[in-house]
Curated annotation (Swiss-Prot):
Catalytic activity annotation: Endonucleolytic cleavage of DNA to give specific double-stranded fragments with terminal 5'-phosphates
Protein function: A P subtype restriction enzyme that recognizes the double-stranded sequence 5'-GGNCC-3'; the cleavage site is unknown.
Disulphide-bridged cysteine pairs: none
Key words, A-Z: DNA-binding, Endonuclease, Hydrolase, Nuclease, Restriction system
Name of the featured protein: Type II restriction enzyme MjaII
Pfam family, one: RE_TdeIII
Family assignment from sequence similarity: Belongs to the TdeIII type II restriction endonuclease family.
Organism name: Methanocaldococcus jannaschii (strain ATCC 43067 / DSM 2661 / JAL-1 / JCM 10045 / NBRC 100440)
Keyword field contains Protein transport: no
One Gene Ontology term of the molecular function aspect: type II site-specific deoxyribonuclease activity
Lineage: Archaea, Methanobacteriati, Methanobacteriota, Methanomada group, Methanococci
UniProt keyword Hydrolase, yes or no: yes
Length: 370
């Protein structure tokens, strides 16, 4: 079953937002070749290793690396998380100032210490059983460890939480991540005792996979590439690459579909197309409400871009604008319509202007019902 048009459009909008924000943060000054003598001095030792031929290529490499770092930060801090929420109908949720039983806290400390010392191997089923038993004991309550689930969603019979990580997490942070996950599961087990509780750690792609197979993954290989990861985590509590994205959506091949959406938008002419569709360029505003209100050639170009970028509801909005531009509107509705068509699809801070679309469609439906 394919992703719904609504989900696809939301992914497209999020992709456009990220691309536009990256264009906004890279000035002509940022892409100039800069003087970096110390970086260059060290980098020359690696020319053969990374396939750089000369200093000119090296300076371009350093400049691109700085920009790429910013893109990686944007993807890790917002894009992956927002796409996960779109696919799962979930949200980010923080838990603090809560209480757990002392017996639970002691059990978590025991599990963590045993994993650290190597006295036990990670086993998610055994750990869950021990946590359930600890929550059922008669024990005083103590403060729990604050935690945030990057993705949280809840069904009738289960609670699912996911910690989204970069594919190269910092060495030494695995112990803390495991501890946080155990606290999160224990708290949910006590507050929602009749529901199954899952807390995964998720990675958006597998960097150890062959680039010719971007959606593929080898969980064992990936886990072994991270310092102390297998020491604390059972592979059953890890979601990676296609496995993660399809789990979130409930549909197969979701990662490929996400990449297809990105690839349809992220092209060299992105900025040119964005600037064209961000307003309604096909309207001849000095000829509104006449047969010459629409520039048909520009309208076709506008619609082609919306179709290519999978902005399905904006296609309906554009059709409504075309119809309304030819109608005899009341003076009050004219004022509303004229203000709406001078709004942008994306604001200066790159926020999608859904209100513009909704108000235009509302006005259109009002006249179509007459």
């Amino acid at each position: 079953m394919p992703l719904s048009k609504n989900v696809i459009e939301k992914i497209s909008i999020e992709t456009i937002r990220v691309l536009k924000s990256r264009f906004d943060t890279i000035s002509d000054e940022d892409i100039k070749i800069r003087n970096m003598p110390f970086h260059m001095a060290f980098l020359r030792a690696f020319y053969g290793k990374i396939g750089i031929n000369d200093d000119t290529e090296a300076l371009k490499f350093l400049t691109l690396s700085q920009w790429f770092h910013g893109l990686s930060t944007t993807l890790g801090q917002s894009y992956f998380e927002n796409i996960a929420h779109i696919l799962s109908n979930g949200e980010k949720r923080t838990f603090k100032n809560y209480k757990i039983k002392r017996s639970v806290r002691d059990k978590i400390s025991e599990i963590i210490n045993d994993l650290k010392s190597g006295e036990r191997l990670p086993n998610v089923e055994k750990e869950n059983k021990e946590l359930r038993e600890a929550t059922s004991k008669n024990s005083e309550y103590v403060n729990g460890l604050e935690f945030t689930a990057d993705v949280y969603f809840e069904d009738k019979d289960k609670v699912v939480m996911i910690e989204l990580k970069t594919v190269r997490p910092n060495a030494g942070e695995m112990r803390g991540e495991k501890q946080k996950i155990l606290y999160g599961k224990a708290y949910m087990m006590e507050t929602k005792p009749n529901k199954k509780v899952y807390y995964f750690i998720g990675f958006p792609y597998d960097p150890t996979e062959n680039p010719e197979n971007p959606c593929g993954y080898d969980k064992d290989r990936f886990m072994s590439s991270l310092i102390e990861f297998s020491k604390y985590f059972d592979k059953r509590e890890v979601l990676i690459a296609e496995e993660l994205w399809s789990f979130l959506s409930g549909e197969e091949n979701t990662m490929k579909k996400i990449l297809d959406i990105i690839n349809s938008i992220a092209k060299p002419d992105f900025k040119e197309k964005f600037d064209f569709i961000n307003t309604f360029p096909f309207i001849n505003q000095d000829r509104l409400y006449t047969k010459d209100a629409i520039d048909e050639q520009k309208f076709k170009k506008y619609m082609d871009i919306l179709q290519e970028w999978r902005l399905y509801s904006e296609i309906e909005c554009a059709k409504a604008v075309k119809e309304l531009s030819l109608l005899k509107l009341s003076s009050r509705d004219r004022r509303t319509f004229e203000r709406l068509i001078n709004n942008s699809m994306f604001s200066n801070n790159n926020k999608y202007n859904e209100n513009r679309k909704m108000k235009i469609l509302e006005l259109y439906n009002k006249y179509m019902q007459k």
